[in-house]
From Swiss-Prot:
Cellular component terms per the entry's GO annotation: extracellular region; fungal-type cell wall
Function: Aerial growth, conidiation, and dispersal of filamentous fungi in the environment rely upon a capability of their secreting small amphipathic proteins called hydrophobins (HPBs) with low sequence identity. Class I can self-assemble into an outermost layer of rodlet bundles on aerial cell surfaces, conferring cellular hydrophobicity that supports fungal growth, development and dispersal; whereas Class II form highly ordered films at water-air interfaces through intermolecular interactions but contribute nothing to the rodlet structure.
Glycan-bearing residues: 108
Keywords of the record: Cell wall, Disulfide bond, Glycoprotein, Secreted, Signal
Keyword Lyase tagged: no
Annotated gene: Hydph17
Taxonomic superkingdom: Eukaryota
This protein's name: Class I hydrophobin 17
Subunit structure: Self-assembles to form functional amyloid fibrils called rodlets. Self-assembly into fibrillar rodlets occurs spontaneously at hydrophobic:hydrophilic interfaces and the rodlets further associate laterally to form amphipathic monolayers.
Length: 112
């Protein structure tokens, strides 16, 4: 019984790790694309996330339709650079010329 529980736990952990959008394809890329440096990363449910998006010039963006973390004012990190004075993230989608990144997960480049 104990060994079955351990096998189930290990399988669940492995599927969680495989589904995480962590950096997997080299020092500055994620499974979803390049690592980005975002000046601000907020969860979409934070009260000020909508005002941050509007302050970035994204008046037409409906924050309520987004899920997860939202990165604002993002730029991809170059192949040989790990310089980011803000938050490094892997994101599902980057739109509005880098103004908004959705589905973002923070990453630590020092451990990649």
């Amino acid at each position: 019984m104990y060994s079955q529980s351990m096998v189930l736990l290990a399988a669940a952990f492995a599927s969680f790790v495989a589904a995480s959008p962590m950096a997997l394809h080299g020092a500055n890329s994620c499974s979803t694309g390049p690592v980005h440096c975002c000046n601000s990363v907020e969860h979409h449910t934070q009260p000020h996330a909508n005002s941050l998006a509007r302050g970035s010039g994204l008046v037409g963006l409906d924050i309520e339709t987004l899920v997860g973390n939202i990165g604002l004012d993002c730029s991809p990190i170059g192949l040989s650079s790990t310089d980011c004075t803000a938050q490094t993230v892997c994101c599902d989608d980057v739109t509005f010329d880098g103004k908004v990144a959705v589905g973002c997960t923070p990453v630590n480049l020092s451990v990649l």
